[in-house]
Protein backbone atom coordinates (compact mmCIF):
# COMPACT_ATOMS: atom_id res chain seq x y z
CA UNK A 1 0.00 0.00 0.00
CA UNK A 2 1.02 3.57 -0.69
CA UNK A 3 -0.28 6.51 1.36
CA UNK A 4 -0.17 10.09 0.15
CA UNK A 5 0.39 13.33 2.00
CA UNK A 6 -1.73 16.46 1.63
CA UNK A 7 0.87 18.11 -0.61
CA UNK A 8 0.54 15.35 -3.22
CA UNK A 9 -3.20 15.96 -3.48
CA UNK A 10 -2.82 19.75 -3.57
CA UNK A 11 -0.21 19.65 -6.34
CA UNK A 12 -2.34 17.21 -8.34
CA UNK A 13 -5.44 19.38 -7.98
CA UNK A 14 -4.20 22.95 -8.45
CA UNK A 15 -3.43 23.62 -12.13
CA UNK A 16 -1.86 26.97 -11.17
CA UNK A 17 1.05 25.24 -9.39
CA UNK A 18 4.19 24.42 -11.37
CA UNK A 19 4.21 20.89 -9.91
CA UNK A 20 0.69 20.19 -11.16
CA UNK A 21 1.36 18.21 -14.35
CA UNK A 22 3.78 15.77 -12.71
CA UNK A 23 1.60 15.20 -9.66
CA UNK A 24 -1.65 14.99 -11.62
CA UNK A 25 -0.21 12.20 -13.76
CA UNK A 26 1.23 10.47 -10.72
CA UNK A 27 -2.03 10.56 -8.77
CA UNK A 28 -4.03 9.31 -11.74
CA UNK A 29 -1.64 6.35 -12.10
CA UNK A 30 -1.72 5.56 -8.38
CA UNK A 31 -5.50 5.83 -8.15
CA UNK A 32 -5.95 3.36 -11.00
CA UNK A 33 -3.14 0.94 -10.11
CA UNK A 34 -3.41 -2.55 -8.62
CA UNK A 35 -1.63 -1.47 -5.42
CA UNK A 36 -3.97 0.05 -2.80
CA UNK A 37 -3.78 3.82 -2.38
CA UNK A 38 -4.32 4.72 1.28
CA UNK A 39 -6.07 8.03 1.87
CA UNK A 40 -6.18 8.96 5.56
CA UNK A 41 -9.24 10.97 6.55
CA UNK A 42 -6.96 13.65 8.01
CA UNK A 43 -5.15 13.98 4.65
CA UNK A 44 -8.46 14.38 2.80
CA UNK A 45 -9.60 17.00 5.33
CA UNK A 46 -6.23 18.74 5.07
CA UNK A 47 -6.54 18.87 1.29
CA UNK A 48 -9.94 20.57 1.55
CA UNK A 49 -8.58 22.97 4.20
CA UNK A 50 -5.59 24.01 2.06
CA UNK A 51 -7.19 24.33 -1.40
CA UNK A 52 -10.16 26.36 -0.12
CA UNK A 53 -8.00 28.71 1.99
CA UNK A 54 -7.85 32.35 0.80
CA UNK A 55 -4.60 32.83 2.75
CA UNK A 56 -2.95 30.13 0.64
CA UNK A 57 -4.46 30.83 -2.79
CA UNK A 58 -5.55 34.16 -4.27
CA UNK A 59 -8.31 32.25 -6.02
CA UNK A 60 -9.00 29.23 -3.82
CA UNK A 61 -10.89 26.18 -4.96
CA UNK A 62 -14.58 26.39 -4.10
CA UNK A 63 -15.64 24.04 -1.29
CA UNK A 64 -17.99 22.29 -3.73
CA UNK A 65 -15.15 21.63 -6.20
CA UNK A 66 -12.85 20.45 -3.39
CA UNK A 67 -15.45 17.97 -2.12
CA UNK A 68 -16.04 16.76 -5.69
CA UNK A 69 -12.30 16.20 -6.16
CA UNK A 70 -12.20 14.08 -2.99
CA UNK A 71 -15.29 12.13 -4.03
CA UNK A 72 -13.78 11.42 -7.46
CA UNK A 73 -10.52 10.24 -5.89
CA UNK A 74 -12.33 7.97 -3.42
CA UNK A 75 -14.26 6.42 -6.31
CA UNK A 76 -11.01 5.35 -8.03
CA UNK A 77 -10.26 1.60 -8.11
CA UNK A 78 -7.17 1.68 -5.86
CA UNK A 79 -8.46 4.25 -3.35
CA UNK A 80 -8.98 3.21 0.27
CA UNK A 81 -10.05 5.59 3.03
CA UNK A 82 -7.93 5.07 6.11
CA UNK A 83 -9.12 5.68 9.64
CA UNK A 84 -7.06 5.25 12.78
CA UNK A 85 -7.04 1.60 13.83
CA UNK A 86 -6.21 -0.11 17.11
CA UNK A 87 -2.45 0.41 16.68
CA UNK A 88 -2.60 4.00 15.44
CA UNK A 89 -2.21 5.79 18.76
CA UNK A 90 0.79 3.69 19.77
CA UNK A 91 2.43 4.14 16.35
CA UNK A 92 1.80 7.89 16.61
CA UNK A 93 3.34 8.07 20.09
CA UNK A 94 6.37 6.03 19.03
CA UNK A 95 7.01 8.18 15.97
CA UNK A 96 6.60 11.39 17.98
CA UNK A 97 8.85 10.08 20.74
CA UNK A 98 11.53 8.96 18.29
CA UNK A 99 12.06 12.56 17.11
CA UNK A 100 11.12 14.35 20.35
CA UNK A 101 8.28 15.92 18.36
CA UNK A 102 6.61 19.18 19.23
CA UNK A 103 4.64 21.81 17.33
CA UNK A 104 4.15 20.97 13.66
CA UNK A 105 6.14 17.74 14.04
CA UNK A 106 3.17 16.34 15.97
CA UNK A 107 0.88 16.56 12.93
CA UNK A 108 3.54 14.90 10.75
CA UNK A 109 3.97 12.07 13.26
CA UNK A 110 0.20 11.56 13.29
CA UNK A 111 0.10 11.33 9.50
CA UNK A 112 3.12 9.02 9.36
CA UNK A 113 1.39 6.69 11.81
CA UNK A 114 -1.21 5.84 9.15
CA UNK A 115 1.53 4.46 6.91
CA UNK A 116 3.26 2.66 9.76
CA UNK A 117 0.03 1.09 11.00
CA UNK A 118 -0.87 -0.12 7.50
CA UNK A 119 2.64 -1.29 6.56
CA UNK A 120 2.54 1.26 3.74
CA UNK A 121 5.02 3.57 2.05
CA UNK A 122 4.36 7.26 2.72
CA UNK A 123 4.56 9.54 -0.33
CA UNK A 124 5.27 13.20 0.39
CA UNK A 125 7.03 16.14 -1.23
CA UNK A 126 8.09 17.07 2.32
CA UNK A 127 11.53 15.53 2.78
CA UNK A 128 11.21 16.23 6.49
CA UNK A 129 9.48 12.85 6.84
CA UNK A 130 12.97 11.33 6.62
CA UNK A 131 13.37 12.16 10.32
CA UNK A 132 10.96 9.34 11.20
CA UNK A 133 13.32 6.36 11.12
CA UNK A 134 10.52 3.77 11.48
CA UNK A 135 8.69 5.18 8.46
CA UNK A 136 9.12 3.85 4.94
CA UNK A 137 8.70 6.90 2.73
CA UNK A 138 9.65 8.38 -0.61
CA UNK A 139 9.38 11.60 -2.51
CA UNK A 140 6.64 10.99 -5.09
CA UNK A 141 8.84 11.96 -8.03
CA UNK A 142 12.07 10.26 -6.85
CA UNK A 143 11.06 6.63 -6.95
CA UNK A 144 13.61 5.79 -4.23
CA UNK A 145 12.16 4.45 -0.97
CA UNK A 146 13.83 5.51 2.28
CA UNK A 147 13.79 3.71 5.60
UniProtKB/Swiss-Prot annotation:
Recorded superkingdom: Bacteria
EC numbers, comma separated: 3.1.-.-
A single GO BP: negative regulation of growth
InterPro entries membership: Mtu_PIN, PIN-like_dom_sf, PIN_dom, VapC_family
Name recorded for this polypeptide: Ribonuclease VapC43
NCBIfam families assigned: Mtu_PIN_fam (TIGR00028)
Reported function: Toxic component of a type II toxin-antitoxin (TA) system. An RNase. Upon expression in M.smegmatis inhibits colony formation. Its toxic effect is neutralized by coexpression with cognate antitoxin VapB43.
GO molecular function: magnesium ion binding; RNA nuclease activity
Binding site for Mg(2+): 5, 108
Positions of the PINc domain: 3-139
Broad class of enzyme this protein falls into: hydrolase
Cofactors (names): Mg(2+)
Similarity comment: Belongs to the PINc/VapC protein family.
Keywords: Hydrolase, Magnesium, Metal-binding, Nuclease, Toxin-antitoxin system
Gene3D superfamilies documented for this protein: 5'-nuclease
Amino acid sequence: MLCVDVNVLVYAHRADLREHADYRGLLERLANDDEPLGLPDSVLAGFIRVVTNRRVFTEPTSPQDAWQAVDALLAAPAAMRLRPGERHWMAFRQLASDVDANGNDIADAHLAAYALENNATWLSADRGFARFRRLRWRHPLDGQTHL
